């Protein structure tokens, strides 16, 4: 059982980190949605231009009103990368297919080369 958990943990870690493991710039598709899953208070301190605020606590109940097509590319960030990873897993379970965990705000800003606004 422990071996199975270790293997599954490794696969999940590789899948999540593999979304953005290029270390360089990422180019979002034109129809992509940039999703900020932080709290409104965190969002007020700075956010990526064009990002849609959808706190993780509201993700499952409100995502369909923000992204109706489950094949739409969704790029997700938070403060540190933990909540964005959780968001990716929740959205996968809901049938969304094209998901990208950008990690924290500064990581996302560097990867996408999008300015941080306040």
What are these regions (language model features)?
Residues 2-8, 19-32, 40-72, 82-118:
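Rhodanese-like catalytic fold shared by cysteine-dependent sulfurtransferases
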Residues 77:
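Short, surface-exposed ligand- or partner-binding patches at beta-edge/loop junctions that are enriched
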């Amino acid at each position: 059982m422990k071996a199975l958990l270790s293997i599954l943990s490794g696969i999940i870690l590789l899948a999540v980190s593999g979304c953005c493991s290029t270390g360089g710039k990422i180019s979002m598709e034109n129809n992509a949605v940039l999703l900020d899953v932080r709290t409104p208070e965190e969002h007020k301190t700075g956010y990526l231009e064009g990002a849609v605020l959808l706190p993780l606590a509201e993700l499952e109940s409100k995502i369909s009103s923000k992204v109706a097509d489950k094949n739409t590319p969704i790029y997700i960030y938070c403060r540190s990368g933990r909540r964005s990873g959780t968001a990716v897993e929740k959205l996968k379970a809901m049938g969304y297919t094209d998901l990208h965990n950008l990690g924290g705000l500064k990581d996302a800003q560097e990867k996408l080369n999008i300015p941080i606004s306040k």
